[in-house]
Amino acid sequence: SQVTGRASEDVVLFVGTGATSAVAKLVSALGLAGPLPPGWKPNDRPVIFVGPFEHHSNLLPWRESCGEVVTIGENSSGGLDLAELEEQLRRFASRKLKIGSFCAASNVTGGLEDVDRVTATLHRAGALALWDYATAAPYVHV
């Protein structure tokens, strides 16, 4: 919380080898690397919500995990479609582990995401909010 100015339950992962390594480390730490563990049913799978402009560093580790990846589209302003995110959070409400993993700024469009609003939406649904600041960090207060 001293670094981010956020709540004490927030975490920042500093990994010197880039965003790909950070996401892969997180996937492993959450026990989600590889196929669905024995005895798990398909509905036991965690669900990972990603945005329309994610860099492969945020996509590939999740696609290689046992989680189900759901892509949220863009709204008319070019940002993440919060209405669609809310709809998908309701659709997957029964999943024990829900994760939103998004870039704070798109390296495709340069657009900044409303991190606080998206995070609040995820938290209201009991989901984790994960943010890749690789593109945004030089331009925003972290």
Task: Give names to the regions the model predicted.
Residues 1-142:
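Pyridoxal 5′-phosphate
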